[in-house]
Amino acid sequence: IVHSMAHGLSALYDTPHGVACAIILPTGLEYNKTAAGERYRAVGKAMGVTGIDEMNDVEAADATIAAVKKLSADVGIPADLKGILKEEDVQFLAESAFADACCPGNPRDTSVEEIKELYRSLM
């Protein structure tokens, strides 16, 4: 979902694609946590999250998401799309993300309405 949502942002707002992905990543991780939380342990382990092997899947996912947010902040990635994303573009962006070739690879089924809410949560 992250990559799909970032494509439209990059095109519409001339935001570098990697930056758009990084801004959206924590939101996408939260969104997919229930469908792929167990996969987050490997990411957290690679990021050096302390004690991750002793955590249950939910704790490991939360710790990994926190580590991603910290890394983003440490390298100056904005935490949201305030001042970038406009409400009048949300419908178009959500429809584009839903139709994007990357969307079917998301671990959780989604909808245009859910993607709209994800964008709005970043405003």
Roles of regions detected by a PLM:
Residues Y40, G44-A46, T50-M123:
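C-terminal charged capping/lid subdomain of soluble metabolic enzymes
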Residues I1-A67:
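Active-site segments that bind and position negatively charged phosphate/pyrophosphate groups
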